[in-house]
Amino acid sequence: MDTKEFPNLTYTRDLQDWGEFVRRTPDEYEAWVNGVTKECTVLEIEILKDLVSRTKKKIFVDTNISVEILHEISDENHVLIMLADPNISVQRFFERPDKEKQFLYQLLLKEDNSEEAMINFRECLKRINSQERYMMFQKSGFNVITRDENRSIDEIFALVENMFGLNR
């Protein structure tokens, strides 16, 4: 992947000091996330075109494609957005066992002032998990499932099947 064409997607690949990643300001972090979304859109649309051309089967993807572009390339009944309360996304970010999240957590703990580093990183997370962004997804016109700790995985699948008309 070319750094000039995809500077945000190649940012972590070319990073010399991972401490720089967790030391970014909320403005820098938000700009990077927005840039990743734009760059992923280009690649993911090409991948989807290729997949669609090779099969007649339904294709399910977890995507970074923006809501605006999804409205251009799909109809409302073919997209599902899964949302968690923004506070959960921020406060419980490191509770998940994902290797990437645990790697970032360890980086933050190794910072000279780990408490300050953690506060800064949570501010970055707050920025990209803002109520404004949440409402943009909520009011996108696409199907939305909001996180409910009392809902089982089977119940979530049943909701998804119903929304996509797969249970007919």
Residue ranges, per PLM feature:
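Short, well-ordered beta-to-alpha junction loops that form the rim of enzyme active sites
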Residues: 63-66, 149
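Short glycine-/polar-rich loops that comprise or flank the Walker A/P-loop
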Residues: 73-78, 140-142
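ATP-dependent small-molecule kinase phosphotransfer cores
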Residues: 2-58, 64-65
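NTP-dependent small-molecule kinase module
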Residues: 127-168
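Structural motif
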Residues: 60-62, 80-81
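Alpha-helix-centered segments that form part of catalytic cores
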Residues: 34-49, 114-139
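Short, well-ordered alpha-helical microsegments
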Residues: 66-70, 153
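A glycine- and Lys/Arg-enriched "phosphate-lid" helix/loop adjacent to the NTP-binding pocket
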Residues: 78-129
